[in-house]
């Protein structure tokens, strides 16, 4: 007798909802839902007598009780204490506005002055530097009468020592005069700082020191080797080593951090490499069997719904139980290849409540490099003087010998055609296989060379009187020297397996054996 299959009942929550109103609920379901079991009563009676809330145990707020959390090794916090302020050892400087320097007003305008400015013709001023007169009064050194300087000598046996007093040098006075002319058309800066370079504003001229005149004495500054600044038209382009693939390289640390917490995390996401090229264009065909829809774009996130009763294995085993397949993401591998990735979500386990549980899967495919083909070695066809020549085949034109006097097509007509009318070309031209050649400044010549389709080899020469062609001869002979055997040698040579002899024996020289037939 077959044993009946045990049917598992529904959860206690669902049974309690339906049987509570009817009053047919089992006791275990009521105790479990209403929390009246023995374990629940022990917790209720025990919590009424013992209170552990101040110790921060179980479901407290985490504030540490009434006293709060106190770090180990430190005293309590003083309430109302004042922090000690340490004065700085250095007195800071007073910050305030700088001294105001009075500015003199140049050419003040009186209230009674007319506001109308008369127009005058300004003569062209010479901006070139002219002769600057420099007046220097140099006073000569006054003459000083010579005086006898006493010389002290000693008579001891030591070395003689001469004590010479230095001559006093009188101070010299040098005076330099300067003359300045006022020009209302320009504003001149008469004082400048001894800096290298010159800067000017619009409608201003800066006159720096040292531009003219004579310098007496040393300049007092050392010459420093200066570097010339390149103009805006001169520039150099340096190739980076190694060549970069982007104008703004990404930091390696940031890229490694993103890669570690992204799709390549093997602890959280399963890594699956896809070899099928359909993954790049139509990844949905790897998950389920379906018809192609050209209006549907595969660049969006796809959701696949599948009933458990009608389970069908996907075309690719790696895409089993995949419910969600994300949009493509492009990245670069450490080896420099382009990677196309899609993040998928599996739905492997399904509970009775309808929740589905599954792992995340990273489907990726690395694109291979496009190898450059080897260059094709081109052969030199010939050298010419520059004149163009076109060689046409025999299919482009046809020559037919026609007698103009005889017209077999016009025999049935009474009207005789004029000989000039026969010169008109009424045929329809077909330019489907033609080539249009547009010449340049040089003259072009067209030559028609017939082409015969024959098995024999032949050479054709094009007559050209305008240019010079260099022809490279080629060996077109196909005949080979035929070696005929000597008449005294046999025509047929038979190789035998006999290794004892050092010659080949002709079959005609062998001894013939008569065949004996036995008759019954």
From Swiss-Prot:
One of its GO terms (biological process) is microtubule-dependent intracellular transport of viral material towards nucleus. Keywords: Capsid protein, Cytoplasmic inwards viral transport, Disulfide bond, DNA-binding, Host endosome, Host Golgi apparatus, Host nucleus, Host-virus interaction, Late protein, Microtubular inwards viral transport, Phosphoprotein, Viral penetration into host nucleus, Virion, Virus entry into host cell. It holds the Pfam family Late_protein_L2. Its main location: virion. One of its GO terms (molecular function) is structural molecule activity. Disulfide bonds join 19-25. GO terms for cellular component: host cell; host cell endosome; host cell Golgi apparatus; host cell nucleus; viral capsid. Highly phosphorylated. It comes from the Viruses. It is found in: Virion; Host nucleus; Host early endosome; Host Golgi apparatus. A motif (Nuclear localization signal) lies at residues 1-10, 511-519. The keyword Phosphoprotein applies. Interacts with major capsid protein L1. Interacts with E2; this interaction inhibits E2 transcriptional activity but not the DNA replication function E2. Interacts with host GADD45GIP1. Interacts with host HSPA8; this interaction is required for L2 nuclear translocation. Interacts with host importins KPNB2 and KPNB3. Forms a complex with importin alpha2-beta1 heterodimers via interaction with the importin alpha2 adapter. Interacts with host DYNLT1; this interaction is essential for virus intracellular transport during entry. Minor protein of the capsid that localizes along the inner surface of the virion, within the central cavities beneath the L1 pentamers. Plays a role in capsid stabilization through interaction with the major capsid protein L1. Once the virion enters the host cell, L2 escorts the genomic DNA into the nucleus by promoting escape from the endosomal compartments and traffic through the host Golgi network. Belongs to the papillomaviridae L2 protein family. This is Minor capsid protein L2. It comes from Human papillomavirus 19.
């Amino acid at each position: 007798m077959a044993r009946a299959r045990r049917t598992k009942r529904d959860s206690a929550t669902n049974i309690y909802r339906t049987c509570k109103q009817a009053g047919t609920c089992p006791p275990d379901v009521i105790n479990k839902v209403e929390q009246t079991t023995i374990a629940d009563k022990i917790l209720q009676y025990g919590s009424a007598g013992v209170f552990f809330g101040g110790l921060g145990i179980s479901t407290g707020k985490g504030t540490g009780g009434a006293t709060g959390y106190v770090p180990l090794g430190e005293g309590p916090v003083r309430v109302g204490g004042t922090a000690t302020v340490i004065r700085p050892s250095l007195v800071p400087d007073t910050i305030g506005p700088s001294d105001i320097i009075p500015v003199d007003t140049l050419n003040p305008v009186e209230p009674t002055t007319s506001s109308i400015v008369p127009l005058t013709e300004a003569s062209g001023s010479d901006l070139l530097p002219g002769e600057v007169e420099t007046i220097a009064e140099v006073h000569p050194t006054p003459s000083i009468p010579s005086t006898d300087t006493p010389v002290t000598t000693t008579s001891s046996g030591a070395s003689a020592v001469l004590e010479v007093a230095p001559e006093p040098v009188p101070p010299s006075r040098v005076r330099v005069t300067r003359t300045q002319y006022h020009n209302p058309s320009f504003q001149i800066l008469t004082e400048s700082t001894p800096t290298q370079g010159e800067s000017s504003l619009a409608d201003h001229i800066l006159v720096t020191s040292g531009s003219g005149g004579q310098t007496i004495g040393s300049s007092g500054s050392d010459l420093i080797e200066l570097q010339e600044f390149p103009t805006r038209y001169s520039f150099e382009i340096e190739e980076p080593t190694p060549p970069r693939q982007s104008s703004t390289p990404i930091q390696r640390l940031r890229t490694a951090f993103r890669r570690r917490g992204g799709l390549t995390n093997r602890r959280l996401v399963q890594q699956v490499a896809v070899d099928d090229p359909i993954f790049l264009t139509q990844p949905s065909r790897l998950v389920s069997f379906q018809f192609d829809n050209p209006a549907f774009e595969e660049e969006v996130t796809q959701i696949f719904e599948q009933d458990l009763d009608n389970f069908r294995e996907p075309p690719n085993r790696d895409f089993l139980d995949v419910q969600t397949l994300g949009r493509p993401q492009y990245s670069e591998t450490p080896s420099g290849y382009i990677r196309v990735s899609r993040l998928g979500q599996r739905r492997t386990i399904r509970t009775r409540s309808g929740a589905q549980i599954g792992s995340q899967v990273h489907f990726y495919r690395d694109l291979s490099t496009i190898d450059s083909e080897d260059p094709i070695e081109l052969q030199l066809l010939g050298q010419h003087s520059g004149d163009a020549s076109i060689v046409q085949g025999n299919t482009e034109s046809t020559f037919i010998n026609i007698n103009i006097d005889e017209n077999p097509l016009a025999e049935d007509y009474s009207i005789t055609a004029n000989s000039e009318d026969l010169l008109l070309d009424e045929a329809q031209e077909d330019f489907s296989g033609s080539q249009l050649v547009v010449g340049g400044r040089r003259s072009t010549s067209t030559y028609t060379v017939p082409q015969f389709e024959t098995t024999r080899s032949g050479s054709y020469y094009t007559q050209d009187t305008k240019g010079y062609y260099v022809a490279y001869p080629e060996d077109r002979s196909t005949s080979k020297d035929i070696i005929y055997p000597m008449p005294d040698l046999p025509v047929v040579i038979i190789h035998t397996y006999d290794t004892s002899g050092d010659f080949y024996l002709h079959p005609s020289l062998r001894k013939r054996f008569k065949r004996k037939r036995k008759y019954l």
